[in-house]
Amino acid sequence: MEEFQGYLDXNRSRQHYLLYPLLFREYIYALAHDHGLNRSILFENAGYDNKXSSIIVKRLITRMYQQNSLIFSAKDSIQNQFFGHNKNLYSQILSEGFAVIVEIPFSLRFLFSLERKEIAKSHNLRSIHSIFPFLZDXFTHLDYVSDVLIPYHIHLEILVQTLRYWVKDASSLHLLRFFLHDYWNSFITPKKHITFFLKGNPRLFLFLYNSHICEYEYIFLFLRNQSSHLRSTSSGIFFERIHFYVKIEHFHFVKVFFDNNFQCILWFLKDPFMHYVRYQGKFFMASKDTPLLMNKWKCYLVNLWQYHFSVWFQPGRIDINQLCKYSLDFLGYRSSVRLNSSVVRSQMLENLFLINNAMKKFETIVPIIPLIGSLYKSNFCNTFGHPISKPSRTDSSDSDIIDRFLRICRNLSHYHSGSSKKKSLYRVKYILRLSCVKTLARKHKRTVRTFVKRLGSEFFEEFLTEEEVVFSLIFPRTYSTSRRLYRGQIWYLDITSINDLVNYE
């Protein structure tokens, strides 16, 4: 095991990057500003000539290292002469600087891995829709699935220790530890099962959270690649700055028990049909045949989180379900595997046979209730899904109102083009279309019926998507044929982000 540990340390970071001096370079904060977390916060302090100065950073670091300034009560922090109401401003500046410099080792390693694997031009691999054809090909042959929420209660020291494997600059890590202990409670707010980051400071803490997940998956991939008993192929590792996506096919199982000193005993059990996919704050894994290997994999995960990452996790929170009786809420879709039965009549001489064929089909539908909830929060409809007008848009011109509704409708249709059943999508388009009409009627102080007659049928044709227009041109007379083709699943490889209305979790 010492040999494995040495290999992990050697491959995490091959170079020592001196990052601490970069905190005092003003171009680092200009770079962070251009990345667009909060584009105005660095220029709202008129006392420093409208620019982020290295003097601010030096003074903040000096105060952080002083024992008296590390403890603030709720009243004293408001009246503090140095921090005062600008405490959030200074912490925002420093957090943006940290976020840029700690990403440097990861970015260099990412570019190196792309050059080594020669997949730099494979931009389609970063598409969200690219995962669904993979699931469609693989999940129809699987039997059991587990949908697991990744534990989020991560201790600060665990985060810093994780970065120690990648960043070898002791000064930066020491300052980061001071910074996190001082500002942790003001930056994140636990809510239900997910850690929500405050809008003013998401970048650094999202990076820390994803680096923790990356460390867990790095051990996972290391054990798979280094063991001769685990011969498998990986379909791709997507290493992004904010979100990391990993999809692995033909994964073989490893059972590992960790203790505090990272000593372990390995049992290798071959399972050529284990699949693992992570998305947002969850992951799911699926396997074929009996649930025995799923239970062993669950045991591995629980021990990994509890003994290596010091995160308490109850095994009972990982349920093993039959794939044919379970639906996955995944990236705006509700995915499931359904059995389609067909009876074939066969006759040989005087004997008649009825053959019942059961075929598995991967279905993806649009969950209408959560999507209507998102439309309700955006004031497009009420809680029952009835369209309403948007008073905030009545000050805009008619063309701007129509263009905005058309853009939202087409983006949703484009994202949900892979749905097996379009009925829910048609209902969403109806809500947006009628909400647009009601907004225009409210602006001109007319009834909806009068305004619809004024717009005519051409207005409703504008809400047709590109696919519907193309099919109507190819099959102008055979409406049933075009409708049957449009009902099929269409996956686009240019979708790299989730629509705000789709991301309702």
Swiss-Prot record:
Predominant place of localization: plastid
Residue stretches spanning the membrane: none
Compartments where found: Plastid, Chloroplast
GO CC list: chloroplast
Molecular functions (GO terms): RNA binding
Keyword Amino-acid biosynthesis applies: no
Single GO BP term: mRNA processing
Keyword Ribonucleoprotein annotated: no
Pfam families: Intron_maturas2 (PF01348), MatK_N (PF01824)
Protein keywords: Chloroplast, mRNA processing, Plastid, RNA-binding, tRNA processing
Role of this protein: Usually encoded in the trnK tRNA gene intron. Probably assists in splicing its own and other chloroplast group II introns.
Family: Belongs to the intron maturase 2 family. MatK subfamily.
HAMAP family, per the entry: MatK
Protein name: Maturase K
Taxonomy of the source species: Eukaryota, Viridiplantae, Streptophyta, Embryophyta, Tracheophyta
Gene label: matK
